[in-house]
């Protein structure tokens, strides 16, 4: 009997791939994302798909904004994926490919694919939606909802601010994919609310950094000795 991996196993594997300390402001998000990805990975009904991959990448990029040192972000992302036995390069590539496949495809095509019993063509997004529709059991996740929302917002930017249009899109797709609309809306409302909090936090951090910079400049200026006039020599005095 195969032993089911535990959260502790996932965390241990994460720290094997990334042992540096993570800034406290971001540590909680990284831990929560790791646990969420782990619980899905060990769920018998869960199946990885490109929309889910886009949700991972989008969520990570959104909530890790402002992290310093920024050059450590790829390593942290890699460790997250390795922690749940996923290939970080594949996750990134799948996210990129499904986002690209959504370009220039109207919502009507999405709806048709989500209601179809058979894949048609080679469009990754449409085939993913068809595959989900055909699946006997589809394990919904918050990360899938974020991926779907990202695609919708990229297709129609009004989705971000137009509640009625966003609700209409989500209602149609949730019905066809047999998703709980209440869960989808609740998860996305929380996601959007948290994004606003991140923006506010970044503004506070920027203001604090600017205030600290000005303080240091002021201190440096106040401690710089003034240039004194050279004293007049005896010879110069006698000449005058």
Swiss-Prot record:
Gene Ontology cellular-component terms listed: plasma membrane-derived thylakoid photosystem II
One GO-annotated biological process of the protein: photosystem II assembly
UniProt superkingdom: Bacteria
Coiled coil stretches, renumbered: 186-222
Keyword Coiled coil found: yes
InterPro entries: Thf1 (IPR017499)
Segments for region (Disordered): 212-240
Keywords: Coiled coil
Its biological purpose: May be involved in photosynthetic membrane biogenesis.
Family: Belongs to the THF1 family.
PANTHER family: PROTEIN THYLAKOID FORMATION 1, CHLOROPLASTIC
Name this protein carries in UniProt: Protein Thf1
Organism: Synechocystis sp. (strain ATCC 27184 / PCC 6803 / Kazusa)
């Amino acid at each position: 009997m195969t032993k089911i991996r535990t959260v502790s196993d996932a965390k241990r594997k994460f720290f094997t791939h990334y042992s540096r300390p993570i800034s406290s402001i971001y540590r909680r998000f990284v831990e929560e994302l790791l646990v969420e990805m782990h619980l899905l990975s060990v769920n018998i009904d869960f199946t990885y798909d490109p929309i889910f991959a886009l949700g991972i990448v989008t969520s990570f990029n959104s909530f890790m904004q402002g992290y310093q040192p920024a050059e450590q972000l790829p390593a942290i992302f890699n460790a997250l994926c390795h922690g749940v036995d996923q290939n970080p390069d594949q996750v990134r590539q799948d996210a990129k490919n499904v986002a690209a496949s959504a370009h220039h495809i109207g919502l009507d095509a999405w709806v048709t694919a989500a209601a179809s019993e058979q894949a048609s063509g080679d469009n990754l997004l449409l085939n993913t939606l068809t595959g989900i529709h055909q699946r006997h059991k589809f394990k919904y996740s918050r990360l899938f909802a974020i991926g779907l929302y990202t695609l919708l917002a990229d297709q129609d930017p009004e989705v971000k601010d137009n509640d009625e249009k966003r609700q209409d899109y989500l209602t149609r797709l949730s019905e066809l994919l047999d998703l709980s609309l209440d869960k989808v809306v609740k998860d996305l409302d929380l996601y959007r609310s948290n994004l606003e909090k991140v923006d506010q936090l970044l503004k506070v951090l920027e203001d604090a950094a600017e205030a600290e910079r000005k303080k240091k400049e002021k201190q440096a200026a106040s401690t710089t000795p003034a240039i004194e006039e050279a004293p007049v020599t005896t010879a110069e005095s006698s000449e005058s």
